[in-house]
């Protein structure tokens, strides 16, 4: 139990992870700032309209200038958010590339070790030995096949014909099912034996 809950595993948070988190937090703050400015712009527009109705043109003009400045700030904020998002994407993609490169490095090391164990010369030697063994076996097969005389060939054919003939002469298997129990034997009645008559 102590091992299970006592010690926490170390979190493997990298510097890149921290940077991505900070960039995303900054982006979220900028979005909140944008929302606040957008709400303020709507209010100031309504207020400028009200001031114009009241005949306070200069105050309305001043308010619209402020509104215009805040709209420019919104545009700048959009650009900053785009830059932050691009930076986050670049960091995340670079992390993926680093993992791919690390995988390629490990794979390359593995291949090099395998090549050291099995060099081209070793492969060529094994293939050569295999071809030699196949050729040797082929020669043995040819010798064995060529060692049969004409009499042997005739004897083989004769045996083959005999086996074929045996199969042809076998009786057919009855198609009717066999009775389950054999019929009981009926006893033969005792006949009286004829008496022998002596010849006179």
Swiss-Prot record:
Lipid attachment of type N-myristoyl glycine occurs at which residues? Answer: 2
Q: Where is this motif: Type-2 MIT-interacting motif?
A: 168-179
Region (Disordered) location: 169-200
Which Gene Ontology BP terms does the record give? late endosome to vacuole transport via multivesicular body sorting pathway; protein transport; vesicle budding from membrane
Keywords annotated in UniProt: Coiled coil, Endosome, Lipoprotein, Membrane, Myristate, Protein transport, Transport
What's any one GO cellular component for it?
A: late endosome membrane
Q: Could you describe the subunit structure of this protein? A: Probable core component of the endosomal sorting required for transport complex III (ESCRT-III). ESCRT-III components are thought to multimerize to form a flat lattice on the perimeter membrane of the endosome.
**Could you tell me what this protein is called?**
Charged multivesicular body protein 6
**Annotated source species:** Gallus gallus (Chicken)
